[in-house]
Amino acid sequence: MFVRALSLRDFRSWDALGLNLRPGCTVFVGPNGHGKTNVLEALGYLSTLSSHRVSSDAPLIRTGTAQAFAGATVVNTGRELTVDLELNEGKSNRARINQSPTRRPREILGILQTVLFAPEDLSLVRGDPGDRRRYLDELLTSRIPRMAAVRADYERVLRQRSALLKTAGGALRRSSRGGGRPSEDGASALATLEVWDGHLAAHGAQLLAGRLHLVHDLAPHLAESYQSLAPESRPASIRYRSSLGSSLPPEFTAPARAPEAGDIAFLEERFLQELSVMRSKEIERGVCLVGPHRDDLELHLGDTPAKGFASHGESWSFALSLRLAGFALLRADGSDPVLMLDDVFAELDRKRRRALAKVALDAEQVLITAAVPEDVPEELDAVRFGVEARDTDRGRISHILEETEDRRDG
């Protein structure tokens, strides 16, 4: 898979960009803050419908405009598709495939598969569980695009159930102070809660089963990737930690356990069981304490948790290994994703640079950003684009300066 053409309009610092790309290695070179990363961010957004830098779409729309546009023509095993996405301030985003509008933007998921490694990825090791859940879900929907709908349904039900818990909790607190029965609203919320328990368990079981299957497939690639980057270090491993607690047998979340046909039904049953156990605590606190939104991906070096104990170099290697494992998994599924490396070579020592360059050389297409050409390993033959931002009366605008080809002897 490779991106043949990229178009941007009013995306971040780019007022207009039309870029033809090719398989192999392409490097965007320029000072920090001049718009290089915005190019990779746009492609990442077309791939995942989210940014690796911000949690909302507003910063992606260039200041002073109300709409941003990103489009890419993707070639995969000889088949060419063009995906377009409009980001609209205060309105729903719109997407097209080969100029035909889609009902929902998520219908473009799976057309462009990317794996992006950026400095922000250190949060995969050192950050909150939400960073690791997002990593899993983006990789999961890249492999199985229909899981985006499952995740959206789960989040919709979660919001509704959380609102009911707050209503029920507030009503019970007021009635206990007054020595009377729960209000009509509180009683209605309690009666409705059981219905939403069923919806939450149904969608949550599908999402949880998908994540567990993913971790099973991902684990050997992670161990291999980390070994190639840090052969002298302790072995790296991952394990899914579920909020279902004692309702779920420990062996069920073991990465070595192969998924089975009855997993979703089993998980739904255990989900409902744990919701029943936690009902009073959830009402008291007014939040949903059970479900995939409370889970984590545990990272270990040997028997030690990576978070809080790994050195800076080990943390970098683990974060990079998670991305490279995702790349290897998508490749094993049958198609090379586009590999994108955002200003990462400067952060790595010589050994890790060589290991990463080896993967990049083997990818069908790799897009790299660097502040200076010397940050890119010599063994990478690259097409290079210079990038510069200029101050104008319409704000700071990024431009492509020139295209050059580097053919250094490695």
UniProtKB/Swiss-Prot annotation:
Positions of ATP binding: G30, P31, N32, G33, H34, G35, K36, T37
Keyword ATP-binding attributed: yes
Xref: NCBIfam families: recf
SUPFAM superfamilies: P-loop containing nucleoside triphosphate hydrolases (SSF52540)
Domain of life: Bacteria
This protein's record includes keyword DNA-binding: yes
Gene from which the chain derives: recF
GO molecular function: ATP binding; single-stranded DNA binding
Protein name: DNA replication and repair protein RecF
Gene Ontology BP, a term: double-strand break repair
GO cellular component: cytoplasm
Name of a matching Pfam family: SMC_N
Species per Swiss-Prot/TrEMBL record: Rhodococcus opacus (strain B4)
Known role: The RecF protein is involved in DNA metabolism; it is required for DNA replication and normal SOS inducibility. RecF binds preferentially to single-stranded, linear DNA. It also seems to bind ATP.
Stretches assigned to coiled coil: none
Main location: cytoplasm
Subcellular location: Cytoplasm
Family in the record: Belongs to the RecF family.
Keywords assigned: ATP-binding, Cytoplasm, DNA damage, DNA repair, DNA replication, DNA-binding, Nucleotide-binding, SOS response
